[in-house]
């Protein structure tokens, strides 16, 4: 080890250990008498690795790189349970394997340390979230270190550390200072857009922007008939604040009024997936719809690129399909319907409703229109007679999340009293509102074709609305016709055509009549980037003269506040801070929202490459060397949000020339969950009386989770339960006949909220980290869900103990450890090398453990002494799974340096050829016995031996042999 750098060269520095403590021996170890003292072994090697900086890594252009990354954890107060390390163990196995294969491996770890749980605790206790977060991180770090992971801890990052979020703020600032060129398909500096406006206005500018952005301007500069086009003279005549407002509509990070899920109890905006049945998933608090001024991210500009580059990624089809569904690209037409009176004549307002449809060929079948309750034109359509009903319905819809509205099959809606003019028939089309139409998808309005859409058909039947039949020979009495091969009827020139034939004609007609355009629509919406929370990244934004300005000269850190709740006016917690409470203050006011939880996690994989750089987020030469993450391992719950945002930010940074690749994760594995066995008690509704499991159906009961540590073989510790839940200290329990209370049970997700978690700490203390590592891999395929069961862990522990004993006996051989082993032993080892290598290349982590068990059993059963040529390769094979024990075994064989730096062994073909083959011998297709024969025998020789075997004569029972079929190396079939 170089004392000045702390870097470690395993091959060079481990010789110091050997020289100091005896050739071929670890520090002070007598292998001849050693048992498997896993506590001493693991403590020793963890200390050795740490002292020597064994896992520190630097760029090395002479070696190929490999980047293995885990989805970093949120450090909760509960610490790790046994489900958390599953992916970490798999990534560690793979990282060690690649190191053995000669790669320069980057394998870092950090913490996604901003988050709501720490803030909720701060609200309850008044303790600053930074304190609890740091305490939780220390606990996580200790748990991770005891498992022997090869993380380069010198690269640790924390998203809540100002030295980290300084660069999150910088990336946001770059997004704020950029626009998206839809023609060149790239992000460009906003200054270039300003220059273009100054030279030519916005003519020939191809920029992603807010739809109808000019309708939202707060200044009357252009007049009521402005269509969004302006000249250079117009631009130059604008004031600075007016230019700022126009530019905001084109920035990639921008301010806009947005309808959000607002949770008053939590005091923040929630994402759609954080709301269920109108309640927050965390805490079950009511959630309502609310329009707020929010920071947004123009991810929609990247929608097509996010779709197109999926094909080049080594991800599962299910993950790619989830991304495609979330982005939701569809081709069709935008059609405009003019506001009209009840006779279909334009009402003179000039207002139009734009709808998107993928089936413009069904335009003849439109019999009503449905708007989302939040659509901005609802108020203008609503008649006085309908206003009360419309307002009541809007209020009801505001209490539902988009997910609830999409999943609710109940039919509901209200007629507004207004109409639009049908562009084809010129007739009046009634306008309704219904919560199955979402403001955030498409235009927030649909043209309803009940003959061709099942949802529209049910709505029309429920409210007795017309269902014009536009299909030839189709009965609509029971359902709509959704067959795209159906023939159109009563559709003018489109009659007699299928959808495929009619859609191009419909698109041509719509554009010729100037009532719409060909359009590509995406389900994905621009992402809300504001949160009304304290514990998040503050924005590097100040306000002056009514305009938002980027702060570039310093990091904006969180101010002191007197409470972590929103203000009485509903302002974010940061609004509580006075000017003197802010470490940094610029302008007239500071932005008081904070960034969402996904901000810091959208680029952390880049910071690992250069974590201590104070002048840039990552030096280009470092990102060029490490490049994309080669293998990313994490839960499937992140297959949409996190991956989309990370891909979006990566493409943006690529566009602006900061990195040389536009996809962050080349390969990815989503590990399955380790499931826990939950226990339940049954309370009679509205009482403090509990009934045992067998009596639960005789009463109206509520099932409650109970801590599994209070349950033994389904029997509940009643005293322990009363102490755990003091509110039930005086509860009555109706017991089984034998006086026990039996709980119910169910296998489900292991989580703190289900009270079914098992700590890895207890298992490490009892069996050791190597045993836990091997056991979690042994449970089953990494990608599958698996119930947690410790019944098999002792078997894995015994396997490691047996391995240790085998090496101990070999080291105690008279005359020392032989250099060579028997041919039989080498066959066993090289068969294991071939199997383990193939399994690791296929990420079949579980079957490696089985292969190693078989090898150790076969080697232990042999009578010949084992030598270095068998034991050293076996120690290397074991190293990714049981690194502590493998180091010990490697030292016992006088291995050079550290086992982790040993070259991965190659299976020698000569030892993979079997010298004996087991032939099943069948008679007329039925196997009757087996024969062990030399692998070198020719088919004719095999046939002769079978014919002469006395068991063949017994099977013939006097019959003659018609022929003998020998499949070399496989089977013999005697045909009688």
Regions found by a protein language model. Give the residues of each.
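Basic, alpha-helical terminal appendages of large translation-related enzymes
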Residues: 2-3, 13-65, 360, 372-375, ...
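Conserved oxyanion/phosphate-binding beta-strand-loop segments in alpha/beta enzyme cores
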Residues: 31-69, 99-108, 132-138, 312-315, ...
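Residue patterns forming the tRNA-binding/recognition surfaces of aminoacyl-tRNA synthetases
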Residues: 35, 48-52, 125-353, 360, ...
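Long, charged, mostly alpha-helical binding arms that flank functional sites
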Residues: 36, 329-334, 472-508, 512-519, ...
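N-terminal catalytic cores of NTP/NDP-binding nucleotidyl/phosphoryl-transfer enzymes
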Residues: 58-133, 157-168, 357-358, 362, ...
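Catalytic alpha/beta core of large soluble enzyme barrels
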Residues: 91-92, 104, 345, 375-475, ...
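Helix-rich, typically C-terminal accessory recognition domains appended to large enzymatic cores
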Residues: 183, 187-188, 249, 254-261, ...
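Amphipathic alpha-helical
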Residues: 296-330, 372-414, 557-582, 874-903
């Amino acid at each position: 080890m170089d004392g000045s750098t702390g870097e470690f060269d395993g091959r060079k520095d481990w010789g110091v250990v050997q020289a100091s403590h005896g050739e071929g021996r670890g520090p002070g170890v007598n292998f001849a008498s050693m048992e498997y003292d896993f506590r001493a072994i693991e403590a020793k090697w963890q200390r050795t690795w740490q002292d020597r900086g064994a896992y520190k890594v630097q760029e090395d252009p002479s070696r190929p790189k490999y980047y293995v990354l885990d989805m970093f954890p949120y450090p909760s107060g509960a610490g790790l349970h046994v489900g958390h390390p599953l992916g970490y163990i798999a990534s560690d196995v793979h990282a060690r394997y690649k190191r053995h294969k000669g790669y320069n491996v980057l394998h870092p770890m950090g913490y996604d340390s901003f988050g709501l749980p720490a803030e909720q605790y701060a609200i309850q206790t008044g303790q600053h979230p930074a304190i609890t977060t740091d305490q939780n991180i220390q606990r996580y770090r200790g748990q991770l270190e005891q498992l022997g992971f090869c993380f380069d801890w010198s690269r640790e990052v924390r998203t809540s550390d100002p030295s980290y979020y300084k660069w999150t703020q910088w990336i946001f600032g770059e997004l704020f200072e950029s626009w998206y060129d839809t023609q060149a398909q790239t992000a460009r500096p906003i200054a270039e857009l300003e220059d273009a406006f100054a030279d030519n206005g916005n003519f020939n500018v191809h920029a992603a922007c807010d739809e109808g952005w000019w309708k939202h301007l707060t200044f009357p500069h252009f007049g009521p008939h402005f269509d969004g086009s302006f000249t250079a003279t117009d631009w130059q005549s604008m004031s600075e604040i007016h230019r700022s407002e126009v530019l905001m509509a084109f920035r990639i990070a921008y301010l806009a009024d947005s309808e959000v899920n607002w949770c008053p109890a939590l005091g923040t905006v929630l994402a759609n997936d954080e709301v269920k049945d109108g309640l927050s998933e965390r805490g079950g608090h009511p959630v309502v719809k609310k329009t707020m001024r929010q920071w947004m991210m123009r991810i929609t500009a990247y929608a097509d690129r996010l779709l197109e580059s999926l094909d080049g990624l080594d991800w599962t089809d299910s993950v790619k399909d989830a991304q495609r569904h979330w982005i939701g690209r569809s081709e069709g037409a935008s059609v405009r319907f003019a506001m009209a009176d009840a006779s279909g004549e334009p009402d003179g307002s000039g207002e139009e409703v734009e709808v998107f449809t993928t089936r413009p060929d069904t335009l003849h079948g439109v019999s009503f229109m449905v708007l989302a309750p939040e659509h901005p034109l609802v108020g203008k359509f609503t008649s006085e007679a309908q206003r009360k009903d419309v307002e009541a319905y809007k209020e009801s819809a505001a209490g539902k999340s988009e997910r609830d509205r999409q999943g609710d099959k109940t039919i509901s809606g209200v007629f507004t009293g207004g109409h639009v003019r049908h562009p084809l028939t010129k007739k009046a089309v009634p306008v309704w509102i219904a919560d199955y139409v979402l403001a955030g998808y498409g235009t927030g309005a649909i043209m309803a074709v009940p003959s061709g859409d099942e949802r529209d058909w049910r709505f029309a039947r429920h409210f007795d609305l017309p269902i014009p039949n536009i299909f030839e020979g189709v009965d609509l009495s029971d359902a709509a016709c959704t067959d795209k091969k159906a023939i159109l009827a009563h559709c003018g020139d489109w009659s007699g055509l299928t959808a495929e034939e009619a859609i191009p004609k419909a698109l041509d007609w719509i554009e010729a009549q100037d009532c719409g355009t060909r359009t590509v629509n995406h389900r994905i919406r621009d992402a809300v980037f504001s949160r009304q929370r304290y514990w998040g990244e503050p924005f590097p934004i100040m306000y002056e003269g009514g305009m938002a300005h980027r702060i570039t000269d310093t990091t904006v850190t969180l101010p002191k506040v007197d409470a972590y709740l929103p203000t009485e006016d509903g302002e974010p917690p940061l609004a509580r801070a006075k000017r003197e409470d802010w470490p940094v203050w610029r302008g007239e006011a500071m932005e008081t929202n904070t960034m969402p939880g996904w901000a810091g996690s959208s680029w952390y994989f880049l910071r690992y490459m250069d974590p201590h750089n104070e002048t840039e987020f990552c030096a280009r030469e470092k990102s060029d060397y490490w490049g994309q993450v080669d293998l990313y391992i994490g839960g499937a719950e992140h297959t949409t949000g996190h991956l989309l945002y990370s891909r979006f930010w990566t493409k943006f940074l690529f566009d602006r020339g900061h990195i040389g690749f536009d996809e962050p994760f080349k390969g990815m594995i989503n590990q399955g969950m380790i499931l826990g066995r939950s226990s339940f008690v049954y309370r009679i509704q509205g009482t403090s009386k509990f009934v045992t499991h067998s009596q639960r159906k005789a009463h109206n009961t509520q099932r409650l989770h109970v801590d599994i540590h209070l349950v033994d073989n389904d029997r509940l510790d009643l005293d322990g339960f009363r102490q755990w839940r003091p509110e039930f200290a005086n509860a009555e329990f109706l017991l089984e006949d034998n006086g026990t209370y039996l709980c119910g049970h169910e296998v489900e997700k292991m989580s703190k909220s289900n009270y079914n978690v098992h700590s890895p700490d207890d298992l490490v203390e009892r069996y050791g980290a190597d045993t836990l590592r091997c056991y979690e891999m042994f449970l089953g395929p990494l990608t599958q869900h698996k119930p947690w069961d410790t019944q098999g862990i002792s078997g894995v522990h015994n396997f490691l103990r047996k391995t240790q004993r085998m090496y101990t006996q070999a080291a105690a051989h008279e005359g020392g450890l032989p250099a060579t082993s028997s041919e039989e032993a080498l066959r066993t080892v090289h068969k294991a090398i071939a199997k383990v290598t193939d399994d690791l290349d296929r990420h079949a982590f579980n079957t490696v453990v089985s292969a190693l068990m078989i090898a150790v059993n076969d080697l232990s059963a042999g009578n010949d002494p084992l030598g270095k040529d068998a034991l050293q390769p076996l120690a290397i094979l074991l190293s990714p799974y049981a690194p502590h024990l493998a180091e010990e075994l490697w030292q016992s064989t006088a291995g050079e340096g550290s086992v982790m730096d040993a070259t991965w062994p190659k299976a020698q073909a000569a030892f993979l050829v079997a010298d004996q083959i087991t032939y099943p011998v069948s008679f007329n297709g039925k196997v009757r016995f087996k024969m062990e024969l030399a692998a070198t025998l020719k088919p004719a020789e095999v046939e002769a031996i079978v014919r002469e075997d006395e068991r063949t004569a017994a099977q013939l029972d006097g019959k003659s042999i018609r022929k003998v079929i020998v499949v070399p190396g496989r089977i013999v079939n005697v045909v009688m």
